[in-house]
Amino acid sequence: MQVVYRRCGGLDVHKDTITATVLVFGEEGQRDVRKKEFGTHWKELQRLGQWLRSSKVERVAMESTGVYWKPVWNVLERTLPMILANPYQVKNIPSQKTDRRDSEWIADLLAHDLIRPSFVPPPEIRRMRELTRYRVQLTGERNRVHNRIHKVLEDANLKLDTVLSDLLGVSGRAMLYAIVKGQCDPGWLADYARGSLRAKREQLELVLRGDIQDHHRYLLGELLADLEFVESKILRLDQELLRRMEPYQDSVERLCTIPGVDVLTAWTLIAELGADVSAFPDAAHAASWAGLCPSNCESAGKRLSCRTKKGNRWLRRALCQSAWAVTHKKDCYLTALFYRRAAQHGTKKAIIATAHQLLIIAYHLLRDRTVYRELGGNFYDQLHPQRTQNRLIRRLERLGLQITIRPQLAHAEPPLTKRPRGRPCKCSERGIACKHRRL
C-alpha cells in the first residue's frame, strides 16, 4: 500500500499515560519505529510536543478517548498538525493488545492515509459547545426536580396539576411556599391564585384538601430551594452564552428566521456546527455527521437496514425538538413536510425527516449568509398540481361520489361597506387603501 506520510506519529491516550510512536519510512521502504511514554500533566505534554517536533513529523493522530484526548489536543494543536480519529473506525486486528502496539497501529494507518479525521471546531466554538451542553444538563436537572415535587404532592393527595396548567408558575409557587410555611386551609391557599385561575376557585379548594404531613413540608421546602438554585445557574449561564455569542449575533438572527428555531436552538447549532460550516463539503455531509440520515447497509443488492446512523446527539436532540415545534405552525412548508411524511412512514420517522430538513436549511443559511424564505404550506400541492388533483379525485370516487372538474371563476371584489355619515374611517391613519363610502 502506498505511503502518503513518511514521517507521522500515533498517540494512545489514557488517563495517566500517553504512549507515542513515531513512524519513519525510508526511500527504499524501510521502517524506523520510535516509541516513548509520557505522562498527562502539563510538563509531560510539553515534553511530548517537543519530542514530536524534534522528530519532524508531518501529522499526528490520536483516538478520541472520552475526555482524555482534550488536554493533549489543546496543547499539541498549537504547533503540530493533528488528526482526531473515531476509535470505532481504527480498531486493530485482533491480537495481543498493548498500548505500544495500538499507538504503532494508529501511526501506520495515518502513514497510509487510512484515517478519516473527526470534526474538531476552533477553540472558541469548543468552549461555547461545553456551555450549551452544560445547559442541557441543567435543564434535565430542573425537570427532575419538577418530577420530585409532583411526586411529593401526589403522596400528600394534592392534585394541583389537574387544575393548574403550570404547577410551578406564579400561582402554583405561591401556594407551595404557603404550604411549606404551614398553611393548610384550602380557602387561604386558593387566594394565591392569579389571573384567569381565580375563576377556578371551587376546583382549587377541592384539590387543595389533602393529607399534608410535616415531612411533606420539609421535602417541598428542600425541593423548591433546589429548583431556585438550578434556575439561578441557568440564568447566569444564559447571560454568559449571550456574551460569548455577540460576535455571532448575525448568524443567530439568520437561524431564528427558520420556523421552530429559537435562540437556544440557534446557539446549539452554532456551538455544534460552528459559524463557518466549510468543514462540511455540503449539507448531506453535515446531516450524516449529525446522524439525521439513513444508514447505508446493503448486501446482495438488498437494503438490510435504513436506521439512522450514530452522530452528534446534542445537535440531533435540538433539531428534533425544533421539528416538534414546527408541527404546530400554520401555512408552513416544514409543517406540510411533516404531515406528508407522517402519512407515509409514521410520526417518529416524520420528525427525523423534518429535523433533517431543518439542518439542511440551517447549513445553507450559515454558508450563504442569507435568511429563510418560506415556501408555504401548499408547496407540494403546487409542485405537481395534476398529480394532486388525480389523487383527490380517486379518494372521493372511493366514497361513491362522481366528480366533475370545472375551472374556478374569478372572485368578484367585495362590495364597499357602508358607514354612517359624519363618522370618518381610519384607513388613512392605518396607511391602507380605503374601500368605505359615506351614505
Residue map of PLM features:
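A detector of single, family-specific signature residues
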Residues: M1-L439
